[in-house]
Structure formats: structure tokens, C-alpha cells
Amino acid sequence: MASSSSFTYYCPPSSSPVWSEPLYSLRPEHARERLQDDSVETVTSIEQAKVEEKIQEVFSSYKFNHLVPRLVLQREKHFHYLKRGLRQLTDAYECLDASRPWLCYWILHSLELLDEPIPQIVATDVCQFLELCQSPDGGFGGGPGQYPHLAPTYAAVNALCIIGTEEAYNVINREKLLQYLYSLKQPDGSFLMHVGGEVDVRSAYCAASVASLTNIITPDLFEGTAEWIARCQNWEGGIGGVPGMEAHGGYTFCGLAALVILKKERSLNLKSLLQWVTSRQMRFEGGFQGRCNKLVDGCYSFWQAGLLPLLHRALHAQGDPALSMSHWMFHQQALQEYILMCCQCPAGGLLDKPGKSRDFYHTCYCLSGLSIAQHFGSGAMLHDVVMGVPENVLQPTHPVYNIGPDKVIQATTHFLQKPVPGFEECEDAVTSDPATD
């Protein structure tokens, strides 16, 4: 098994250093970072200018209303928003009926980042609900009785690992899950998202993530997968959904994280990838865009910034002498300022950018990115930078799985005590024809 425990992370110290210098985004000269279109307007430049104007309004309002600007994470408001979401959703969420394990994961992970305990009765209810989402054929669907799909399977396994109880672990049918993964495996090393569905890098990551957490990796399950992911890296340096496609932050994270799990990071051109992802941080806003010439979006606070710890580790293993020993290779302060000033809904929850509505997806990934930006390294290299008040500090998140590092260790330790299901039987079960049995 490609053990995740080799990727060591830490729990934050009782008190983390607080950044005391003037806010980066409120410097008088910061306006010079805005887009210069050289008097040649395009649809892209017009949309970018609109976003920058909204961001500037937020920065100016913050500067006007705070004689001594101090950033505050509205923890209590976010907690109450998340707590309500676990029990009751409005009809606006009907469109996510096929994403219900995702809602469980987004909310539970947000709560663990805020260091809010999950009541036992809630944990049990989540376990029982996710068990209803599990298919008799293996994997999890987007809701009870729905077809299994790798995306909700990833979300369900992560949610159960966050709960981290024997009850939660026992929900996962590992034998059937392995059979399901084999049914999705393609000859070129890629995976379908679901039976009869599409292939892209997300599926390789989801498969590698759940297989490594639950200890069901077999000798041939990921044969050819690293090579297929490497073919998805394009001339830009990032990774597209499939070979030949445009580089995208979500796909790039999935590709690199899958290769970290498989211990095949060197399959990629890491320097080219580093240049691409660091170029995605917006100079004026401080947040990240998902693709070249796209707008800033709070969710990429994780999908893009989460790549930097993975790249740091991979380049460090190669002995790169240019690596910082105290900071990730992006502007951690600017990202924290964007999230805390521009992405918090006054009523709780976080959002894409000013003018957008809050939702649990953006709450999860904005908080995850904020955690990445606050915490650097481990052990002797531990260095935290927390913008604003000391209470803003979040729990760390594991950049491969995006759950707590302690929950990764706990889950892998638990499942390593169990044997890998007999993969020969799994292959036979997948290839057999029920009509002739």
C-alpha cells in the first residue's frame, strides 16, 4: 500500500504567531496591481475589471470602517450555518439531490477545521444515512438508491473518516468497494467516474484516495494510472481533465494528489507545474483563479493553494536548494486577506467572491485554503502565519485528502490491521457474466 502516513503533518501549537504588519491589500500602492488592458477591451478584461471594482469596494470599506484593521474569522456564524445544514436544507438545495454525501463531507470537514466536535447522535445519523447511499455493488451513490459514482464515494469515505469511529469505518464494504473500482478501471490506466460514464483525472484521484485510506490497493489496481495522469499535463504546466485538454486547478490538484498517493510524483514536470500554479494567484485580489484568464474564486483557495505543500514535499525530496524553509511558494498573507475580507457572508458561511451567495462547497474549500495558508511544515520546520486575531487559527488539513491529518493516520492505522481483500476474486466478480453463471 502507498501509505499516507509517510506524509507527516502536525497539530497546531497552543498559540500561533499572528501577522502584525500592515495588511497587504490595504497598502496605498496596491491599486497598481489592478488589470492594465492597454486600452484594448475584451470580454475577459471587462469581467475582470468588474470583479476588481467589487474587490476594491470591499478593501476601501474595510479600511474606512477600521482605524486599526484586524481581520476576524466569524467562527460562531459559520458554525451555526453549518450546524443547521446537517439537519435541514432549504428547497434551494434540491439540485444537489445527487450530491448528498458531498454535503455531509463539506459540512463535517468545515466543522473539524473550526475545531467543533461532532455530537455522537449526529455522527450516528450521518453513518446510517451514508450506509443507505452505499450500493450493493460497491461504492456510494449521490443519495439512497442511486447508482454508485466515484465522486460521492470519495465524499462518503472522507466523511466517515472524519467521524473516525468503529461505527463509521464499519459502514464501508471494502470488498465490494474494491470490486467497484475494478469495474471502472480502463486498459490505459484511467478510471470511469461511474459505469458507462466519463473518464477524467478526478476519477483517478477519487479511486486512489478511497483505496489508500481503506487499504484495498492491490498490485495491479493502479497499473498504468500514473503514466495516464502524466499524459494529462500539458504545455502550460498544469493538468487537464484528459490528455490534450486545458490545464485546470481542480484537475491539477486531483492529478498531483493521486500521484503522491501512488508515490509517482516524478512522473510530472514539477518545475513547470510550480510555475503554472503560482501564476494562478491573482495579484490584486489575493485569491486564486482556476485557469488562465479566468476570475478569482474562493474554492481555488484549496484546489490551487493545496498544490503547494504537495509540490514543496516533492521538490524537497529532489533536493531543490531554492525552497523556503518557512513559507509555501505562494503569498500566504494575501490569500488569507482575500478569504477573510471578501469571502465571508455576514450571516455565516463562505462564498466564491463578493456578490455571490454562500454555500457549503465554498465554505469547505475557503476554510481549507485558509488552513493551508496558515500552517507551514511540521516538526522543526513548523512555521505558522495567522492573519488577524489569534482566534482565526484553524485546524490543519491534510493536503492530499483534505481531512484532518490525525484522521488520516487514524483511518489508515485502522484499515492496515485488516487484510487487503482478495483481488483475484474481485477481478473474477467483475468479469463474470451473470447470464452464464
UniProtKB/Swiss-Prot annotation:
GO terms for biological process: cell population proliferation; fibroblast proliferation; lipid metabolic process; negative regulation of cell population proliferation; positive regulation of cell cycle; positive regulation of cell population proliferation; positive regulation of fibroblast proliferation; protein farnesylation. (2E,6E)-farnesyl diphosphate binds at residues 248-251, 291-294, 300-303. It is an enzyme of class 2 (transferase). Zn(2+) binds at residues 297, 299, 362. Gene3D superfamilies: 1.50.10.20. GO terms for molecular function: acetyltransferase activator activity; enzyme binding; geranylgeranyl diphosphate synthase activity; protein farnesyltransferase activity; zinc ion binding. It catalyses: L-cysteinyl-[protein] + (2E,6E)-farnesyl diphosphate = S-(2E,6E)-farnesyl-L-cysteinyl-[protein] + diphosphate. Its EC number is 2.5.1.58. The record marks 102 as: Important for selectivity against geranylgeranyl diphosphate. Essential subunit of the farnesyltransferase complex. Catalyzes the transfer of a farnesyl moiety from farnesyl diphosphate to a cysteine at the fourth position from the C-terminus of several proteins having the C-terminal sequence Cys-aliphatic-aliphatic-X. This is Protein farnesyltransferase subunit beta. It comes from Rattus norvegicus. The gene is Fntb.
